[in-house]
């Protein structure tokens, strides 16, 4: 069992139609056909959307995505029209809202890996390959991959697992031309992101991108980009291959839920418990730190304080 512990009730805004409630984002349509994406403070782990939120998380994700869209705009166009909430939207939508072009989404999670960890490490340990890409022998948790590899996955619904697939499987389902285009753009975006992050003392271990077709038939970058929710960021100064790496994402939440302290059994059908304040505060601080280190901006420019 998985999904929402407490599924939120959509906000009613004049002129907007609620379309979907995701793990983190709520999606609405305007009367003129644009999409409105609102990033909440919800957090997910182990396929559950947890009952505890991380304050300001949605604003940090949105503002970081906007910054990255600017850094990547010469590689591929993106779906953003505006970051101004529609008229009549709640005050809380400020800083966490994107008005976007409506796209025909490609049903593939486009994952790039520059370091071996997570599900990629598990697959490599079992088979010597990740998503059909053979890798050298002797790699360990945290090993750097040069060149980075493209490891796509099918996109799952809330509460379901994404399925890692090979490039050949993507080609069979969607055509070889699109498969190769997705691979090329994903790796180009990853390489740019890795270079920028390393200059700021952060390793971009892996990340995922989503793409869609616009009305002109052009491939466009969509959703969130290079955030702690879609990526693994590691402090460069603490990187030590052969062990789990310290991270700027929600790993502290996963660790607590997996600990005896939480009292939660992942294999049961029991929903996960609320997070303690210390875990919430630590997670929030990590999101703020990675935002500020990457962008060079302070979080208070979108009304976020450190306390």
Swiss-Prot record:
Domain of life: Bacteria
Pathway named in the protein's UniProt entry: Purine metabolism; IMP biosynthesis via de novo pathway; 5-amino-1-(5-phospho-D-ribosyl)imidazole-4-carboxamide from 5-amino-1-(5-phospho-D-ribosyl)imidazole-4-carboxylate: step 1/2
Gene Ontology annotations for the cellular component aspect, listed alphabetically: cytoplasm
Catalytic reaction equation(s): 5-amino-1-(5-phospho-D-ribosyl)imidazole-4-carboxylate + L-aspartate + ATP = (2S)-2-[5-amino-1-(5-phospho-beta-D-ribosyl)imidazole-4-carboxamido]succinate + ADP + phosphate + 2 H(+)
GO molecular function, one term: phosphoribosylaminoimidazolesuccinocarboxamide synthase activity
Keywords assigned: ATP-binding, Ligase, Nucleotide-binding, Purine biosynthesis
UniProt keyword Ligase present: yes
Gene Ontology biological-process annotations: 'de novo' IMP biosynthetic process
Recorded family membership: Belongs to the SAICAR synthetase family.
Name listed for the protein in its UniProt record: Phosphoribosylaminoimidazole-succinocarboxamide synthase
Species in which this protein is naturally found: Thermobifida fusca (strain YX)
